Swiss-Prot record:
Entry protein name: ATP synthase subunit b, chloroplastic
Assembly, per entry: F-type ATPases have 2 components, F(1) - the catalytic core - and F(0) - the membrane proton channel. F(1) has five subunits: alpha(3), beta(3), gamma(1), delta(1), epsilon(1). F(0) has four main subunits: a(1), b(1), b'(1) and c(10-14). The alpha and beta chains form an alternating ring which encloses part of the gamma chain. F(1) is attached to F(0) by a central stalk formed by the gamma and epsilon chains, while a peripheral stalk is formed by the delta, b and b' chains.
Keywords: ATP synthesis, CF(0), Chloroplast, Hydrogen ion transport, Ion transport, Membrane, Plastid, Thylakoid, Transmembrane, Transmembrane helix, Transport
Topological category with respect to the lipid bilayer: Single-pass membrane protein
Localization terms from the record: Plastid, Chloroplast thylakoid membrane
UniProt cross-references to InterPro entries, sorted A to Z: ATP_synth_b/b'su_bac/chlpt
Domain of life, source organism: Eukaryota
Organism: Cicer arietinum (Chickpea)
Residue runs in coiled coils: none
Residues of the signal peptide: none
Annotated Pfam families: ATP-synt_B (PF00430)
Length: 184
């Protein structure tokens, strides 16, 4: 390495008139040396620079394509999600309406059932009252009839003879049988 540096230093000490050499002082270099160096850099660096730019361009295009594909996939998923959301909202509305109508239907059924039960209780109450009234009337009639019969028997026994007594008893038994048939 020292030999290469020494050779460049030797070249810089040579007189510039009539010879060709490298001038290491950048401010003192002439335009021709700069153009030669730039020409060499452009000639040899052009391929490297073109490859770098092409690679960068390909990466950018690949990234753009991937981004577009991801965007399209995201848009597709978003549309599917929106469609699912609309479907679920429609089902929720349908269930809500069905639920409300079912609740109203059950409410009406319950009200009708309670009304029917109350009517049955009212009918049972009225039947029970009528039965008890009829029972009380029958008991009063039987008691009145027994008392009347006892009073009549007492009166007959005291005032009638045996033959008249038997005829009166037969007539009363006939009347009692007719009353009993009438009540049943």
């Amino acid at each position: 390495m020292k030999n290469i540096t020494d050779s460049f230093l030797c070249l810089s000490y040579w007189p510039s008139a009539g010879s060709f050499g490298f001038d290491t002082d950048i401010l003192a270099t002439n335009l021709i040396n700069l153009s030669v160096v730039l020409g060499v850099l452009v000639f040899f660096g052009k391929g490297v620079l073109t490859d770098l730019l092409d690679n960068r361009k390909q990466r950018i295009l690949r990234t753009i394509r991937n981004s577009e594909e991801l965007r399209e996939g995201a848009v597709e998923q978003l549309e599917k999600a929106r469609a699912r959301l609309r479907k679920i909202e429609m089902e929720a509305d349908r269930f809500r309406l069905n639920g409300y109508s079912e609740i109203e239907r059950e409410k009406l059924n319950l009200i009708n059932s309670i009304y029917t039960t109350l009517e049955q209780f009212e009918n049972y109450k009225n039947e029970t009252i009528n039965f008890e009234q009829q029972k009380a009337i029958n008991q009063v009639q039987q008691r009145v009839l027994q008392q009347a019969l006892q009073g009549a028997l007492g009166t007959l026994n005291s005032c009638l003879n045996n033959e008249l007594h038997l005829r009166t008893i037969g007539a009363n038994i006939g009347m009692f049988g007719a009353m009993k048939e009438k009540n049943n």
